[in-house]
């Protein structure tokens, strides 16, 4: 390696671009009537360094959060832009806006009703929490607090009288807090069926190799920078998105209320999840409309990170770590028995270390295929660094049945997309192709994988940008650190977070799964398919609209030649002729 460029000089941060792909356009005012003394052409001349006089009647500039998806900034710096748009303050403002809707029932006929609908601002509050966020908060608690115990503290925050209800204008609290692990299990089965051709698969299947699409940072990067990989992205929604769709569709149809009356908060390890929640593909315009993306009601109304959970408690005037880790208050039953059993299963299933810290999409596919082929073995081949690993499923006879890989971090992702880039064909008759087309088919590493698990963060989702870091003041104070933590301390801290993530009770697996045909890592694919089919029947919506999503190339006009106005032409011409004003 060159002495000028070392590994220490490299990182995954890309500075935001200075140009906006959606510049503010000022519409021309109506032309003055003929004969007006002021109707002659006037050109405003501005000296260098001066700003034009603001027009008092100019319309306010508006840039929607969806427009941010098309910005020229990078995906890893998106959190700096979006943190003020979806934050803990938005949660508090919403809770204090009006009395919450209350679920009543069931009555003698098994029907539920909702009280408070006469107030148009009233909402039914539901929160979903990721296991990575629970692990981060558990590590911050210290003293051997497990992920499950941290989860109970979060439930006390959202459901208990000593949580957010304390000090609020209306004393509002959430009706339910659900675990995104349940939605993750559904996405694992859906993803396996998509890759292996199972019973449930999207009509528009992804091209091989199928690439994970549950990481919004990676998806945003692909849409803006490498659109040629979009056909490879898995069509299965992320656990956050699937949970949002499940809650909004089920509750709105069962309770006969509009989707906007249900307010869904997600607690995630990543700031880029705020980007995901703003996607037009994840609104009721898709599942309740014509199936096409549009500006409808979001399936996830707000996303906050693990760090912001602490800020949420502090804004109400108490310390999150003072909350009890005991069982939370009893909540109403979900108004559908099968979905209730799916969302609120007893126990807490332990995460598999082999599956990693990002949900285990690839590992589940391998284990599912292995379960169908007795005697086969999974072989692991380490890559160039810890965030690149290749996996092979070897049949009992010795042949390779399936290959998959794990690529974490943008440095490794860039190597992956380079291998997937289509070859440039020569324009000369009989010319040789360029790039990857020179290599024989099947020889290029990365192209013969059946599945690739791609995550933007090195180390996976437990190392997300919204996680609590070792140099955060709360960790420094609770650990009593005398000096500022460095990279080595962060590595040790990450190990603590990972240990909390893998903590759990093995007895938490569903006992009823054992009686079914096939169980993979404690998950019954047939049981998940039954739940998904029931969900589709209950809502009257095709599963294609509920469980799958789409992607689109984001085209930027940065660097493209733009049309000049008459004023700009006059100024440019004067500069050329007279040497400038």
UniProtKB/Swiss-Prot annotation:
InterPro entries membership: Cytosolic_Fe-S_CAF, Fe_hydrogenase, Fe_hydrogenase_lsu_C
Binding site residues for [4Fe-4S] cluster 1: 20, 68, 71, 74
One MF annotation (Gene Ontology) recorded for this entry: iron-sulfur cluster binding
GO CC annotations, alphabetized: cytosolic [4Fe-4S] assembly targeting complex
Span of the signal peptide: none
Superkingdom of the source species: Eukaryota
Coiled coil, from the record: none
Cysteine pairs bridged by disulfides in the record: none
Protein family according to the UniProt entry: Belongs to the NARF family.
Name used for this protein in its record: Cytosolic Fe-S cluster assembly factor nar-1
Gene: nar-1
């Amino acid at each position: 390696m060159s002495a000028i460029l070392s590994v220490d000089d490299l990182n995954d941060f890309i500075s935001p671009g200075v140009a906006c792909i959606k510049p503010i356009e000022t519409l021309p005012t109506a032309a003055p009537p003929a004969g007006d003394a002021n109707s002659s052409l006037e050109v405003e001349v501005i000296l260098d360094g001066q700003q034009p006089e603001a027009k008092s009647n100019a319309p306010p500039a508006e840039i929607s959060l969806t427009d941010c998806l098309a910005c020229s900034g990078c995906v890893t710096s998106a959190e700096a832009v979006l943190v003020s748009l979806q934050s803990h303050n938005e949660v508090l403002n919403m809770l204090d806006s009006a009395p919450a809707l209350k679920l009543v029932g069931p009555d003698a006929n098994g029907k539920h009703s909702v009280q408070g609908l006469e107030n148009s601002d009233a909402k039914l509050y539901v929160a979903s929490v990721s296991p990575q966020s629970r692990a981060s908060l558990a590590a911050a608690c210290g003293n051997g607090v497990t992920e499950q115990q941290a989860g109970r503290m979060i439930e006390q925050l959202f459901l208990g009288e000593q949580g957010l209800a304390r000090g609020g204008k209306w004393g509002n609290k959430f009706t339910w807090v659900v675990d995104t692990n349940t939605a993750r299990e559904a996405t694992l089965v859906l993803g396996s069926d998509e890759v292996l051709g199972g019973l449930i698969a999207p009509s528009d299947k992804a091209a091989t190799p199928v690439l994970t699409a549950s990481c919004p940072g990676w998806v945003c990067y692909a849409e803006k920078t490498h659109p040629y990989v979009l056909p490879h992205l898995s069509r299965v929604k992320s656990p956050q998105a699937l949970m949002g769709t499940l809650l909004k569709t089920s509750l709105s149809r069962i309770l006969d209320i509009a989707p906007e009356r249900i307010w869904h908060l997600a607690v995630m390890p990543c700031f880029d999840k705020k980007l995901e929640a703003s996607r037009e593909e994840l609104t009721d315009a898709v599942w309740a409309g014509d199936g096409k993306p549009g500006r409808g009601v979001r399936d996830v109304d707000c996303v906050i990170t693990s760090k912001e959970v602490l800020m949420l408690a502090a804004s109400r005037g108490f310390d999150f770590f003072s909350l009890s880790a005991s069982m939370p208050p009893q909540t109403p039953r979900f108004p559908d028995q099968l979905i209730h059993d799916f969302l609120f299963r007893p126990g807490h299933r332990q995460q598999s270390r082999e599956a990693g810290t990002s949900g285990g999409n690839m590992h589940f596919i391998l284990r599912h295929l292995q379960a169908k082929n007795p005697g086969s073995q999974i072989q692991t081949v380490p890559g160039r660094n810890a965030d690149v690993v290749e996996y092979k499923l070897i049949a009992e006879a010795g042949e390779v049945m399936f290959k998959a890989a794990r690529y974490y971090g943008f440095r490794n992702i860039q190597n992956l997309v380079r291998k997937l880039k289509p070859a440039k064909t020569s324009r000369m008759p009989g010319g040789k192709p360029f790039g990857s087309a020179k290599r024989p088919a099947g020889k290029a590493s990365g192209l013969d994988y059946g599945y690739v698990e791609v995550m933007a963060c090195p180390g996976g989702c437990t190392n997300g940008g919204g996680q609590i870091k070792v140099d955060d003041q709360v960790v420094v104070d609770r650990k009593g650190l005398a000096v500022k933590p460095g990279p080595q301390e962060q590595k040790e801290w990450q190990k603590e977070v990972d240990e909390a993530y893998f903590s759990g009770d093995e007895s938490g697996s569903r006992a009823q799964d054992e009686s079914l045909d096939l169980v993979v890592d404690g998950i019954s694919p047939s049981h998940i398919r039954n739940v998904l089919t029931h969900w589709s029947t209950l809502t009257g919506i095709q599963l294609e609209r509920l469980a799958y999503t789409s992607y689109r190339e984001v085209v930027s006009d940065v660097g493209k030649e733009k049309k000049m106005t008459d004023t700009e032409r006059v100024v440019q011409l004067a500069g050329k002729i007279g040497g400038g004003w």
